[in-house]
Amino acid sequence: MKMNLHCFANLIPIMILALFSNSGLINATEVGKRTDALEASAWNESKWISAVDAPVVKGHNNGRAADGASWFVSTVKNEQKIVSAKWMTAGLGVYELYVNGKPVGGEFLKPGFTHYAKTKRSFTYDITDIIRTKPNAENMLSVQVTPGWWGDKIITPGGYDGMIGKKCAFRGVLELTFSDGSKRRYGTDLKNWKAGIAGPVKHAGIFDGEEYDAREPMGYECVDKLSTPEENTEFSGDILPSDGAEVYLRTDLALAPVKAYVWKNVEGAKENEFGKVIIAREFASGTEMTVSPGETLVVDFGQNCASVPSFVFKAAEGTVLTCLPAELLNDGNGAKIRGMDGPEGSCHRENLRIPHTGIR
C-alpha cells in the first residue's frame, strides 16, 4: 500500500506557533475578536460541566493522559434581533471554541499553564460578526476540551494516584444584547448543554502528542451522540481574565524544509554502530511525496524548534500515518558510544521524555 503526502511540517518557535506545508503556508481561519471579560459575578450564572462518559486515569502508572476528547454543545435561539454577542470562556484542559462550526480565536493550547488548584485563565470573545442576528435564528456553541494542563503528566508528579485533574471541563457565559437595549446571559448548565466523548481527536496531551482520526465527524456534527453533562466540582480556585495566550499563529515565521527523503535499508552497520540509512528518494519542496510500506520519510527543517506538524495525505482507508518529531538526526554512522539510537540520517528520539509517542 502506498501513501501519497503533500507533506508539511508546522513550526512553533518557542511561544510562537507557525503552520506551514511544502506547498505553502497553511492558512488557519478563525473568527471572533478578543475583548474584555464580563464582570467576575457573571460566572455565578454558569457551572463547570463535564462529560459523564469521560474516562478517568487511575492507579500509579499515570504516564499517559485519558483517551478521547470531551465535547460540549448548546444551541441558543434569539429572542429578538441581536446587536452584540460576547462569550466568556474557561476550561479545565486545553480547549477550542466553535460558533456555528467555525473556530473562534487565534490562540493555541488555551488556557496555558497555571497553578492547577489556584488559578484558571478566561478568554472572552466578541462574536457579534459571526452569529446569526435575526429574531428566532439559532446559533450553535461548541467546545472541544482535551486533558492538557489539567489531566495529564505535565502537572502530575510521578507516583501520584491517577492524574491531578480527573475530568476535562468547560465553563462559559454568553451575553447577548438585543436591539431594544436589553441583555440576557446564557451560562453553561446541565439543562441546555450536551456533552460526551466524540470527534476525530482520539488522544491528546502536552507530552503525549495527538492521535487524530480524520474519518470521524467533529463533535458539533454528531450532537445525537452527546448526552446531559454532569457538574464538575474539581476546581475551586479563581478564574481570572487572560491578557493573551502563550502561543499564537505566526505565519510570517513559517519555515520551509531544507531536505526531505525516504529511506528503507541501512549500510555500514557494525557491532557498536547502527550504520547509515540508504536514501531511496529525495523530494523537492512543493512536490508530492510517496511513501510505501516499510519506508520512512524524513522531513528536515535544518534546525531544532517547537513545532506542530500539518499533513495532507491520501491513502487507503485504515492506513495509519505516524509522525514522530525529533530535535536532531542521528549522525556519526549511528555510533552507540555517542548516544545514537539509530542509523545516521534517521530521527533521534531517545532524548525525549516520551520517545515512542507522537501524532497518529
Language-model regions, residue ranges each:
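Extracellular/oxidizing-compartment recognition motifs
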Residues: 29-360
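Bacterial Sec-dependent signal peptides at the C-terminal "C-region" and cleavage site
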Residues: 19-33
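N-terminal secretory signal peptides that target proteins for export/translocation
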Residues: 1-8
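Bacterial N-terminal signal peptides
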Residues: 10-22
